Every structure is written in C-alpha cells, then in structure tokens.
Curated annotation (Swiss-Prot):
Residues 356-380 are annotated as: RCL. Coiled coil: none annotated. It comes from Oryza sativa subsp. japonica (Rice). Pfam families: Serpin (PF00079). The reactive center loop (RCL) extends out from the body of the protein and directs binding to the target protease. The protease cleaves the serpin at the reactive site within the RCL, establishing a covalent linkage between the carboxyl group of the serpin reactive site and the serine hydroxyl of the protease. The resulting inactive serpin-protease complex is highly stable. This is Putative serpin-Z5.
Amino acid sequence: MAPPPPAAPPCPGLTELALRVARRIQAGGAPDGNLVFSPLSVYAALALVAAGAGGDTLAELLGVLGAGSRDELAGLAGRLAGRALADRSRAGGPRVSFVSGVWYDKTRTLSPSFRDAAVQSFMAETRAADFREKPGEAVNQINAWARKATNKLIDTVIDGGLPADTDVVVANAVYFKGKWKDPFTKALTKTGKFHRLDGAAVDASFMQRGTYYDTGDYIACHDGFKVLRLPYDDERRRSPASPPPPPSTPRFSLCVFLPDALDGLWDLLDEIASTPGFLQAKLPTRHASVGELKLPKFKLTFSGDIAGVLRGLGLDATFSDGEADFSKMVEDDGGRRPLSMRSLVHKAVIEVNEEGTEAAASAINMVCGMSMTPEPRPVPVDFVADHPFAFFVIEETTGAVVFAGHVLDPSSTAGALDDDDDDDEFVVMGCLRYLLDRCMAFVGV
C-alpha cells in the first residue's frame, strides 16, 4: 500500500527559498562545483532574525520568506521543531537534531518580546557573553554549545574570531542521520563512468539494485526527467499485527531529480524554481518495478558566506549598515548605534552510501511501470544516475525541504563557494549523515 500523500509545504516560501538560494549559490560559485545546503536551517535562522526586525528590514525578510507576519513565521518554526524535526531514533527512526541559540554581549539587553519568541517559538537558548573583553572565550562557548547539542558531531559554528564590534550572534545547527528502508547491497557496488557537464567522464562507485528488483523505491517518469524517491527507515520492525504509525509520524526520503539529457540539469532546475508547486507535484508516491537502478555514492561539503546570495534575493536593507532595523532585538540604551547583520555563514556536509543518508521526501505523481494488480507484470523502470542530478531531502508530513543540492562530479567533495578542506571532521566512522551548522553575527555600526 502506498503511504498517505505528503502534505503541502508548511509555508510555500520555504520551498521557494530552497530553489532560489540553490541557483544563486551555484551562479556565484564554481560552474562545475557540487552543492549541498540546508534550506530549512537558512529559513529558520532568517525567521528568528525577523523576530527582532522592524520597518523595511522586517518587510524584506517577510517577503523573501513568503510569510505575512512575524507570528506566522514563529508558528511555522514551532510546528517544524516540534513535529517534523522531532528525534525518532529511540523508536527506530532517523536521528535528528535541530537547535538554535542566541548570544548577546553582556553590555546589551535582549528585548523581552524577542527573547520570548526565541525561547518559546524557536526553542532557542539565550545567553550573555563577553564579546568585548573575552571574544575568544565567547567563541569557545558557542562552539562548545554546538558540540554538546549535536553529540560532538558538529565541532564548530564559528571558525576563527568575530568582528571586534559583535553584539549578537544567532546560531543554528541541524543534524540528520537515517538508514535506508531498503539498504543497498555493498557487494553490488561497482565502479562506472559518470559523465560531467563538460563532457569528461570520471570514475564513480555506483550503488545498484539487482536486475528487475521489486523494491520499496519509488520512481516517477515525466517529460524530460525522472524522479527517484528513496525512503529512510522510520521505525523499528513491527509485527504484522501491529497498528500502523499515526499519519503525523515524521517520514523522510531522499529524492533525486535526473534529467534525461546528459546536460539537462540547469534547464530542469530552472523549471523547478520557476513553477510553483513543481517540486512536490513531481514526486512519486507508488512503488516501482525497477529494471536497472544505479546511484553514485557521494560526499559533498559546503562552506561559505551567503550574505551576497541573500542580498540578490532582496535582503538589501537587512545587510546594509545604517539601513537595517533590528530595534526589536535589543533594548535601546540611548547611546549605542543600531545593529546590522554582516554575514550569514553556512556549512554543510552530506555523505551517501549503501547503508543510508540523511533524509526527507514527499509528493504525488504518476509513476511509470506500476500497477495495483499483479497481472500483467509492470514494465520495469530504469534509473541510471550517471550524469548530473539534483537531490532534495524532504520531510513528508510537512513537505519541508531539509537539505538540497546537486551532484556534478561524485568524485569531488568540494562544493560551490567551498573554501574549507577540514570538513571531514564532521563525518564520523563513514556513517551516512547530513551535518549542517551556520551562524550569523549581528554587529553594531
């Protein structure tokens, strides 16, 4: 039986932001670079920032986030943190960690309304720090929080120091580890050729299913592309007599969008980004009879300041000294200049292998080669990802895009804007996981 249809996105702005940010990051980075990032983390961080914004800055943030008010954003954050991102590892499901924190210089005072929103809606910790006299100690405190919050899986949210005039730091960390519901057999993994956009071919390790293998995988065939959905295990094995889990139980999948043309990725991504509802509408919802299934193992990293990307989406005042309005974040002491956001630093790591990954998935569409009756046997569907493709990790009950990216060369770990060669420390014992951490510094101008 097919699972219940996934819900519409909790806020269309989340999906739209995911697609727009992905295209702008790629446009500003290496043209042949891979990409992984967490739209959900960026969205949640900006939503928390909006809780302390006013005037044109708030209007900009609401416009980019696709929301009508601060209250709407706070409600969305609460639903996601309490439902979609609830940790289900004790029940046999994915291990999820989603945490936020706000640090402010001890000479500042957070406004009560912002503090309440941060704690109650965003479930964030708020702490005073000595950014002026002991900036190194403050950075260590923030990084220690990240390590504790993620069981040492995320080591730092701040690399190096902070600007001397830092007043507020907002940090968020997301971690997801899931095992495939139907794991790949390691013995079937073989080296093959992956065709890059420049026409060159590189060696890659392809995970495979057996020929004509009836799996728990989902494949949808569309004009010019196919979509593969690989569900992650969401619970311990139950006896046949056990009742099914409630519909609200979080479910995650990895969704791979593969163009038919070897060089068709950019056209496909443009179509996804420009057509409202396209992403969810094209996801498969029924099992497929698979002929040949090949997906390369890959590990991607990303590290970079995406403030410029967000400026390009319309956050001009937000990142402009003298124009930003964060008057709702701290109390006015009469002698301090207003706050301005200088940067949004984003880091992400993903590794995919035979055992699992990080997951989120959803949607509905017609699937090729499937039938609800045993006869006639469905025509097997091939899905051979031997050329550039896009991927999305989606939480199905909410439609939230937790992670997104694309693979242009599975033999390379570096992503667009990636400037950090030390991200391997985030991946432990070869387990499949997404790791993401990002921080934002608010500084007085």
